[in-house]
């Protein structure tokens, strides 16, 4: 094997790991979408379904963006479109959490605030502005994940009702 071939393979390995990691994230996104549907179905079956579909569409757009990974401008443009769908998912998730009665209202409000960053940032980038508000609005999303890990086990009685 030539030295150039070895260098090529060594440089390719991190790229392959990155792509595999991204596909795992996409699979987890779809899994989370389904789990959130069942978790929030008691609040509103239709809105819960719509919320989950927006997350699945985001995952599909993310997958599509991978085909443009060689062209970073196109990749990020496609990803920005996906972020808008993810933001709408968070908007609906925040609404459902707020209305649930079995999750804290403040958490729903923070998720709603997080949705604004995912919706507004890409729209501003498409308009030519480089403003990042998402780096300040993501806390609701992170706190929701922690809340589910810490308190979510106790929700099994609520979710088990069809």
UniProtKB/Swiss-Prot annotation:
Pfam families recorded: DUF4386 (PF14329)
Gene Ontology CC terms, in alphabetical order: plasma membrane
Organism the protein comes from: Archaeoglobus fulgidus (strain ATCC 49558 / DSM 4304 / JCM 9628 / NBRC 100126 / VC-16)
Membrane topology field: Multi-pass membrane protein
Leader sequence residues: none
Keyword Acyltransferase: no
Transmembrane segments: 15-40, 47-66, 76-98, 105-124, 128-150
Cellular localization per UniProt: Cell membrane
Name of this chain's protein: Uncharacterized protein AF_2041
InterPro entries registered for this protein in UniProt: DUF4386 (IPR025495)
Alphabetical UniProt keywords: Cell membrane, Membrane, Transmembrane, Transmembrane helix
């Amino acid at each position: 094997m030539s030295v150039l071939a070895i260098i090529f393979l060594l440089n390719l390995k991190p790229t392959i790991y990155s792509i595999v990691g991204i596909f795992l994230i996409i699979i987890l996104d779809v899994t989370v979408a389904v789990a959130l549907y069942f978790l929030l179905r008691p609040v509103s079956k239709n809105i819960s379904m719509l919320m989950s579909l927006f997350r699945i569409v985001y995952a599909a757009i993310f997958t599509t963006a991978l085909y443009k990974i060689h062209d970073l401008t196109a990749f990020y443009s496609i990803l920005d479109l996906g972020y808008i769908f993810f933001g709408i998912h968070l908007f609906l998730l925040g609404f459902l959490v707020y209305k649930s009665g079995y999750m804290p209202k403040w958490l729903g409000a923070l998720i709603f605030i997080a949705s604004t960053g995912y919706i507004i940032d890409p729209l501003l980038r498409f308009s030519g502005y480089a403003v990042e508000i998402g780096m300040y609005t993501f806390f609701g999303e992170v706190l929701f994940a922690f809340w589910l890990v810490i308190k979510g086990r106790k929700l099994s009685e609520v979710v088990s009702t069809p």
